[in-house]
């Protein structure tokens, strides 16, 4: 188990702070710690709610890289409002409106979907 913890700490950029108290970690590091705790269970599916909320630009970039790495061999569902971040990590984008799927597909297709434009841009 300890070897797995060391391995996961490396994946989520926490090797250097592995022995620190979680309260002393930055916001981004705390998010990575939570992702690491999920990875310890070796899930086939991960669901992350706004994983980059409150992160610095550098932490956001590292998180995008992390999600691209951990999505190899598993499905990762990310709920996120930051479309610039979504562009970096998503293969498929689903836009919901009032609990129903409004549009789904590649980012460019979704962004140009007239329904999405009408609902979110009011045009």
Regions found by a protein language model. Give the residues of each.
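Conserved catalytic motifs of ABC-family nucleotide-binding domains
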Residues: 42
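A short, surface-exposed alpha-helical micro-motif characterized by mixed small hydrophobic
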Residues: 86-88
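Catalytic Walker B motif of ABC-type/P-loop ATPase nucleotide-binding domains
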Residues: 46-50
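Conserved ABC ATPase "signature" region
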Residues: 1-17, 65
């Amino acid at each position: 188990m300890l070897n797995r913890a060391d391995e996961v700490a490396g994946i989520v950029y926490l090797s250097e702070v592995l022995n620190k108290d979680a309260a002393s970690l930055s916001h981004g590091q705390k998010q990575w710690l939570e992702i690491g705790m999920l990875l310890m269970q070796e899930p086939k599916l991960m669901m992350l709610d706004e994983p980059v909320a409150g992160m610095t630009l550098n932490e956001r970039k590292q998180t995008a890289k992390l999600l691209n790495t951990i999505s190899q061999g598993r499905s990762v569902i990310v709920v996120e409002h930051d479309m610039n971040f979504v562009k970096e990590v998503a293969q498929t984008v689903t836009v919901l409106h009032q609990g129903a799927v409004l549009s789904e597909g590649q980012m460019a297709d979704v962004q140009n979907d007239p329904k999405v434009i009408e609902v979110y841009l009011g045009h």
